[in-house]
Design a protein with these regions (language model features):
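Bacterial N-terminal signal peptides that target proteins for export
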Residues: 1-9
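Bacterial N-terminal signal peptides
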Residues: 8-18
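Predominantly soluble domains enriched in secretory-pathway, periplasmic, or organellar proteins
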Residues: 12, 21-348
Length: 348
């Protein structure tokens, strides 16, 4: 893989357009500015992404470009971009449409960042500072989510095609174990405090808790997302609140106790994942079809209260939140955009 350095000027656009919510809430959309961070698309006209990740140690956002075969590393201090190229890609037919598959999963590890590639079913470790690839492993199914588990020094990889999770050694990236489930794995959240990994069964409308050491499923809770099932997931380790992404809303489950549903909030259509800031107890949910970012506060009882709904861009979803509460949103297959969308709170 080759690393290239690019420097783009991010186009900053203030969006104060009111969305169809209550007047007091709509007015608060003006408390955010939205800009685009341009990424090199090599003539493709758009960049398709799934997972992105934020590394608080370096301040970098890592964004795999599936159809480009590159991983973009954005310095959030100045939006400068470095590109790691030459990841494998291939063209496959999905639902009667041809799509390019390539690097899509990403997780921040200990000094390295793990990249999952759907084209060759590889998981590679890349140095978080030099951006040099260190080692790669392969599994015999298409990887989706990739997550580093610090307490066990493992990388867990969801493989929805065969309803499995593959557990890799974080150093060698050799597969240690294969866990098979009754549903299609989707999303992940590590709860180090309770020694659990939370995961959804997208086709069963269930959210599960798995013991990181024994690998046993400890609990299954109704996600109540409906026909589309649950997608992404995040956890507040202090409170035990689990945030579940449904296609048109976000829900809070009490995973610290019995998995009871505590609250939900409408977000607009096109939600795939969500981001949570434990420092401010704020949930951020990008909706790709609705082209908006929902910002909500979570109180000590798990109740969600709307702060703002911010107009973004068609396809903007799967956000990560930085230490400064800036939200970087990935771009999906919807619409055309060669870049990331960034929503920043306006300084008062």
């Amino acid at each position: 893989m080759k690393a290239r350095i690019y420097l783009f000027l991010a186009a900053a656009v203030v969006l104060a357009v009111a969305l169809p919510v209550a007047n007091a809430q709509s007015a608060q959309s003006g408390n955010y500015t939205v800009r685009t961070v341009a990424l090199p698309d090599h003539g493709k006209g758009t960049i398709a992404m799934d997972y992105i990740a934020y590394d608080p140690k370096t301040g970098y956002v890592w964004a795999p470009g599936i159809n480009i075969g590159s991983v973009y590393v954005v310095d959030t201090s100045d939006d400068s971009v470095r590109e790691i190229s030459d990841f494998p890609t291939n063209e496959v037919e999905l639902g009667g449409r041809k799509r390019v598959q390539g690097p899509s999963g990403v997780s921040i590890g200990d000094g390295v960042v793990y990249i999952g590639d759907r084209a060759d079913s590889s998981i590679c470790a890349v140095d978080e500072k030099t951006l040099v690839r260190k080692s790669c492993g392969h599994i015999d199914s298409t990887p989706d989510g990739v997550v580093y588990v610090a307490s066990t020094k493992e990388v867990w990889v969801t493989a929805p095609r065969d309803n499995s999770v593959r557990i890799l050694d974080s150093g060698s990236l050799a597969q240690k174990e294969k866990l098979t489930f009754e549903g299609r794995p989707e999303g992940y959240a590590v709860d180090a405090k309770r020694g659990r990994l939370y995961m959804n069964y997208e086709d069963k409308d269930l959210t599960t808790a798995i013991d990181l050491k024994t690998r046993k499923t400890l609990a299954k809770w109704p996600s109540s997302c409906g026909e589309d099932g649950p997608h992404g997931i995040s956890v507040d380790q202090q409170t035990g609140f689990l945030f579940v992404a449904c296609s048109t809303r976000a829900e809070v489950l009490d995973a610290g106790h019995n998995g009871e549903k505590l609250s939900s909030i409408d977000t607009g259509d096109g939600v795939d994942d969500l981001a949570y800031s434990p420092a401010t107890h704020t949930l951020y949910v990008g909706a790709a079809r609705a082209a908006q970012l929902t910002v909500a506060h979570v109180d000590d009882k798990g109740k969600l209260t709307l702060i703002a709904q911010v107009p973004t861009h068609e396809g903007a979803r799967n956000g990560v939140v930085t230490k400064n509460e800036m939200v970087y949103l990935a771009h999906s297959q919807l619409g055309k955009l060669p870049g990331l969308i960034v929503a920043s709170p306006t300084k008062r």
